[in-house]
Curated annotation (Swiss-Prot):
Annotated SUPFAM superfamilies: Translation proteins SH3-like domain
GO molecular function (one): rRNA binding
Subunit field text: Part of the 50S ribosomal subunit.
Protein name: Large ribosomal subunit protein uL24
Phylogenetic placement of the source organism: Bacteria, Pseudomonadati, Thermodesulfobacteriota, Desulfovibrionia, Desulfovibrionales
BP terms from Gene Ontology: translation
Role of this protein: One of two assembly initiator proteins, it binds directly to the 5'-end of the 23S rRNA, where it nucleates assembly of the 50S subunit.
An example Gene Ontology CC term for this record: ribonucleoprotein complex
SMART domains: KOW (SM00739)
Keyword Chloroplast listed: no
Domain of life: Bacteria
Classification via PANTHER family: MITOCHONDRIAL RIBOSOMAL PROTEIN L24 (PTHR12903)
Gene label: rplX
Pfam families registered for this protein in UniProt: KOW (PF00467), ribosomal_L24 (PF17136)
RNA-binding among keywords: yes
């Protein structure tokens, strides 16, 4: 299975596409599609049919569509810019991510 340098609940910035420059939180990672769902980014409208058994109303709803993972970059809290991510070990032996620009640890 492929590993990624970004995780669920990370703050990311879109670096390519129609929503370039927008910032949001990762809601879900889709490894089979090599994509991510980012909160309030890449919104699409879907027409849904009412389902009386599930008590869901019909109509037009807006939801997030997947973005390719190469179009997002992790946002560093230290320098507030998209970051290239590296890994290092702390003094107690814990592996952590860090921003290669400002050397700030990313939780």
């Amino acid at each position: 299975m492929k590993t990624y340098r970004i995780r669920k609940d990370d703050k990311v910035m879109v670096i390519a596409g129609k929503d370039k420059g927008k910032v949001g939180k990762i809601l879900k990672i889709l490894p089979k599609r090599n994509a991510v769902l980012v909160e309030k980014v890449n919104q699409v409208k879907r027409h849904t049919k009412a389902n009386p058994y599930a008590k869901t109303p019909g109509g037009i709803i807006e939801k997030e569509a997947p973005l390719d993972i190469s179009n997002v970059a992790l946002l560093c809290e230290g320098c507030a810019k998209p970051a290239k991510v590296g890994y290092k070990y702390t003094a107690d032996g814990k592996k952590v991510r860090f921003c290669k620009k400002c050397n700030h640890e990313i939780a």
